[in-house]
Amino acid sequence: MKGLESRIIRMLETLLGTRLVSIILFGSSIYIGRGRDVDILILIDSISGLDEKMDLEEKVKMLLNRSFNYEVVFDAHILDLEQFNENLKIGSFLSGLSLGYQVIYDKNNVEEKIVEMLKTLSKSRYIMVNKYGRWNLSKIAEIKLRIKEKNH
């Protein structure tokens, strides 16, 4: 996976330049170890509107999918820092990061912000249901935090 990560970083640095803040891999390819696609969350400094967001997401998908000859399919999600911070709450799509994520590039210490969200999530009662099953995100967040504490 390291080769994949470094290629992703290089391509996104080239495409986004200094706007690139963080890259986070998440989704079933991370928490199950396999999946149809690789979900990638890209944080940039700012987005001027929905049109730019959609345009950038499409450019990223095309760039990555072509670069990997469609052998690996990428699903890109782009947020600016404000949107990222707004989504660090229980019930947002970022709650799913508790199932598994990997920060592969970071200029803004997003790991700390995600850990804070996991702490809040671990104290709540939140269940997520998706096509892979029913997930007690509160319990999973609690376990992830214990593992992180052990590893540091």
Feature-to-residue mapping (PLM):
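Short beta-strand->loop micro-motif that forms the acidic, two-metal-ion catalytic signature
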Residues: 39-43
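Catalytic core of pol beta-like nucleotidyltransferases
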Residues: 1-22, 30-35, 45-152
